[in-house]
Amino acid sequence: SAVDLQLADTTVSAKRGTIYDANGNVLAESASVWQVVMSPVNFKNDKQRQAAAKGLSEIFDLEYNDVLDDTKQQSHYVVVKRRIESDEREKVLELIDTLKKDYSCSGVIQLLDDYKRYYPKNSLASSVIGFTGSDDQGLEGIEYEYDSYLSGTPGRIITAQNARGTDMPFRYEQNVESEDGNNVYLTIDETIQSNL
């Protein structure tokens, strides 16, 4: 009898390149943050679903019933929250640990690397530098004009799981590494720009 396989395909973010001025000062950069994703098909019972929904709704101030509904989806990949900082990451790690210890529940919540765009010089040269949207795509200025150069290539993790949702042996996982974006060096000088 053939094993009924399901593929989980997870996207891994690529780090966007940094924009520098003529003297090497950072004008735009990406800092590490995390994305919280859930694999609802891996829940084995309602107790696990309720514990996960309670924990996630408390950490992120989300509606419990909305999160509980998400835990019932027949999906390997549901985004719970994007771009969380390290304090929230610690709470998620504690929740993952609690689910494993108290509910024998693992493989349902994951933290994936993500990036958040920062502009250390604030509005300085913002008309030139531009900005990115929530999907990290350049929308104005240098961020837009050099988007394909700055953005890099996202990676993927493809995992085969049997019909019961348990991971198959390691050989069924395929990783495609993400490639970080390129840096851009501008000819403008931030000290001169700030005096204009």
Model-found features: residue ranges?
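Helix-start/capping segments and mature chain N-termini
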Residues: S1-G55, L62, T166-Y172, N183-N195
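Small/polar-residue-rich segments within soluble enzyme cores
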Residues: A51-E58, D70-G181
